[in-house]
């Protein structure tokens, strides 16, 4: 019985099992050919349909719709967010100056608080000034490069905040659970190491996200339904496959955020166990009072972030802007008040600073 030969099968077999006369390819050439085939397949998986290719582009600019698209809302919103920005910058700047000018505040806890205040100033400066300009502008545009730059520093400073909060939790753990070894453990070298990690890890994280975002191909629409270039709203404009990007957000991003959060949880569990062993009620109150401000900031910061980012891209809606405002605008503004109102040393330091400024 004669076998039917499929020409396509023969071609594939001949590619790998050619006779000696035609088999001039070495192993490296075969690997190269297979690599080109795999690369072509991967590109085809990431490409949109032929119908949509004509609408693909890398836009020169985006349009930020902001908090409201109604013209009559723009000036009232400007009147609301300008004072918020000024209060945030001035409040955090006063915290920094008070800590630097008072020798009693030259401790690891206040060192990290001063750095947190500096990062909060940078954090809101990345977002609010551009938002204020757009409130008074008719175009509300942001260039492609400016958008990626804003996204980079937003992610970097936001994650730096979380790592600094973790460093402050570790400081409180050592102060309460190991008070006799506090100076030795929380040395200048340890504080600098925690500070370097708090800056380096978030910046590597941001760089990875920006590189992945820059590989995306966008559709004809360049309208971002948000008040700044956040990761999720920009992803929604992409026509190319952003599966890798979305998986990275949900895995690597989760790891970057959960690492400091885990440090905070473990530190406070150890603190709770230690405080419950204190016999006097006054001692328990004193121990908890040193952690109250930090816990309030952690709750505000991580509560809004977990609600916003740990959800699929398809579930992201305009309503999530409220959660974004909490951790991008309100939390940096409230930090100086939270850390100073219930902190006797901080209030005294601020009072001394204000007295010096009046005398000058």
UniProtKB/Swiss-Prot annotation:
A single cellular component GO annotation: plasma membrane
GO molecular function terms noted in the UniProt entry: G protein-coupled receptor activity; olfactory receptor activity
Respond yes or no to whether keyword GTP-binding is given for this record: no
- Sequence similarity: Belongs to the G-protein coupled receptor 1 family.
Describe its function: Odorant receptor.
> Where is the protein found, in the record's own terms?
Cell membrane
Which residue positions carry a glycan here? 55, 315
Recorded coiled-coil stretches: none
Identify this protein by name. Olfactory receptor 1L1
Q: Name one GO biological process term.
A: signal transduction
UniProt topological domain (Extracellular) ranges: 1-75, 130-150, 209-246, 310-321
Which UniProt keywords are listed?
A: Cell membrane, Disulfide bond, G-protein coupled receptor, Glycoprotein, Membrane, Olfaction, Receptor, Sensory transduction, Transducer, Transmembrane, Transmembrane helix
Q: Which residues cross the membrane?
A: 76-99, 108-129, 151-170, 190-208, 247-269, 287-309, 322-341
Native organism is Homo sapiens (Human)
- Residue pairs linked by disulfide bridges in the UniProt entry: 147-239
Q: Which Pfam families match?
A: 7tm_4
């Amino acid at each position: 019985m004669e076998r039917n030969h499929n020409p396509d099968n023969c071609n594939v077999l001949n590619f790998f099992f050619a006779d000696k006369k035609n088999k001039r390819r070495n192993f490296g050439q075969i690997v190269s050919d297979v690599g080109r085939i795999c690369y072509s397949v991967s590109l085809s998986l990431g490409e949109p349909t032929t119908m949509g290719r004509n609408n693909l582009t890398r836009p020169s600019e985006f349009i930020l719709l902001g908090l409201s698209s109604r013209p009559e809302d723009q000036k009232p919103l400007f009147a609301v967010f300008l004072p918020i920005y000024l209060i945030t910058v001035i409040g955090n700047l006063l915290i920094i100056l008070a800590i630097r000018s008072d020798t009693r505040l030259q401790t690891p806890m206040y060192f990290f608080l001063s750095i947190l205040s500096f990062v909060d100033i940078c954090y809101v400066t990345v977002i609010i000034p551009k938002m204020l300009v757009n409130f008074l502008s008719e175009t509300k545009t942001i260039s492609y490069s400016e958008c990626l730059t804003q996204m980079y520093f937003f992610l970097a400073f936001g994650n730096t905040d979380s790592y600094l909060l973790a460093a402050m939790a570790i400081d409180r753990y050592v102060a309460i659970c190991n008070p006799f070894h506090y100076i030795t453990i929380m040395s200048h070298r340890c504080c600098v190491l925690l500070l370097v990690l708090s800056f380096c890890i978030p910046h590597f994280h941001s760089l990875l996200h920006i590189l992945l975002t820059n590989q995306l191909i966008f559709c004809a629409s360049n309208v971002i339904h948000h008040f700044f270039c956040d990761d999720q709203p920009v992803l929604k404009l992409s026509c190319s496959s952003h599966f890798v990007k979305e998986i990275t957000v949900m895995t690597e991003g989760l790891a970057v955020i959960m690492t400091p959060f885990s440090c905070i949880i473990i530190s406070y569990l150890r603190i709770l166990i230690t405080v419950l062993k204190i016999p006097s009620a006054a001692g328990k109150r004193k121990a908890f009072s040193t952690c109250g401000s930090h816990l309030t900031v952690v709750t505000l910061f991580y509560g809004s972030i977990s609600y916003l980012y740990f959800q699929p891209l398809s579930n992201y809606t305009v309503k999530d802007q409220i959660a974004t405002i909490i951790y991008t605008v309100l939390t940096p503004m409230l930090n100086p008040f939270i850390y100073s109102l219930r902190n006797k040393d901080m209030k005294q330091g601020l009072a001394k600073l204000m007295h010096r400024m009046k005398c000058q």
